[in-house]
Amino acid sequence: MNPHFRLLCLSLGLGAFIGTSVAWGAFAQLDRPDATAGYLARLLINEVPFPGERGYESEANSQAAMLEILWVLHARIHLIPNGYRQTQVAGVQSKDIIDVITGAGGRRQCEGFFRDASGRFVTAPRVQERIDNLLSIANGGSKPGRFAAMLNYAQGLAQAYVKEGMPGADRYAGLKQVGPVTVTGHAYSWMTDLDAFHPGGNFVTIPDTDDGSLGGNRFFTLRKVPK
């Protein structure tokens, strides 16, 4: 999964889903980190670049990556293809999105997101430090800008998912062929978009021609017929 981005320096309709939250300031706020929607929002934020960070292209590109990451998590629970077991795809057997994020038995699915010795879902200190920094920037001006929009978009996605399920279309749902390889459609993994990173096994890289690179991440689908 994506390493921690180093900071260099949505106000969409989804805002309607934002309920009881921990407010940082006037423009951007996140739900509590011990709430499912707050924890999920922090993952979406952590996995994409913000302005001034490596891999950042645009607000829309990073937001698209957030949505596809959410689709990966959803697919690992609800869209396991024929011929695969959930444990092969997600590393866990669970209907709980928190389990899919944190992994089980010491195996972490998303770097910096895990359960502590008491079983509480927590983040690594560096994750919270970056999020605090992003919130500070978002709420530090005289009016909301890109940082606030991106933070609120992530929280809106998370709240919408927890309350009503997937809030947007999966751009990879109809993908059937990658080169000579027949694939399942949907993405089931994402990693930092570097050639050296690949989840291996039956995962197939989604190419640029199918928008496989979003928000500094490369997305992967699965072979239709497992090896």
Regions found by a protein language model. Give the residues of each.
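Bacterial N-terminal signal peptides
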Residues: 10-19
